[in-house]
Amino acid sequence: LAELLGVEVLREVEAALKRVKPDVILIAEPWSFRGHIAGALRDTGWASWNDGYRDFMKDYVRGNGDGRRMEYFLRGSPWYFAKWPAQSINYTESHDDRTWIDVIAEREDGNGHVPTAHDRRRTHLMAALLFMSVGVPMISAGQDFLRSKHGVANTYQRADLNALDYRRLRRFASTHAYFAEWI
């Protein structure tokens, strides 16, 4: 929630940390309920989560998206988001909100607990694009075995949905292996 701190405070934090550890890696979640500062972080040493990448990939794997935007994201979002390659933290799922498989599930209720073959193919396409894109790929715990929160978006106090179901690792071993090959 770096936006709450603001760019000037983030610059101060960066300067202080780099005095102690010059090669420190700094990553920001560039938004809050008030706004978004990813573009402003472009001229700092901070990398940030690329939510534009996340949103585009969700649409692209469903057949919506154009080649120019795909090229932009494959190149690491260079014109607005990132000045240098590692500044773009490319992701399609994080700890918050619904999981990737719930978001792209064919089921109308958005529950990806029982993914279709198409859902799995879309996930493999996303993984290939994520790992070949310029920038830093970020995957969420369990994303490689199609973790589902049963379509629930806000699981802040839902340990039953936030816990990893490792039985899915066996059930979706080929998807896990596909991610592992890219890594």
What are these regions (language model features)?
Residues 1-4:
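Active-site groove signature of glycoside hydrolases
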Residues 10, 14-141, 145-146, 150:
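Conserved alpha/beta catalytic core and glycan-binding cleft of carbohydrate-active enzymes
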Residues 156-166:
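Acyl/amide activation-and-transfer machinery of modular secondary-metabolite enzymes
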